[in-house]
């Protein structure tokens, strides 16, 4: 299991809007591997500034390939992406 942490470029809202439909299609196509995810925000009611996605991938390379195919990554929305091994410990699982 891996956590994918993405941070947007400043002022990337127009790019998010441009690639949103393709990004949502990408998420749907890959839903068997995506355990959960959603936007990161600086304030609860603020704009998206990134994303956190937890995926069921066997290797870091598989998780990196998955995010590399995301239209938000390909379209220049994300300034940085980190892929880290993740272990769920709470709640018990």
Where are these regions (language model features)?
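Conserved, structured core segments of small domains
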Residues: 1-93
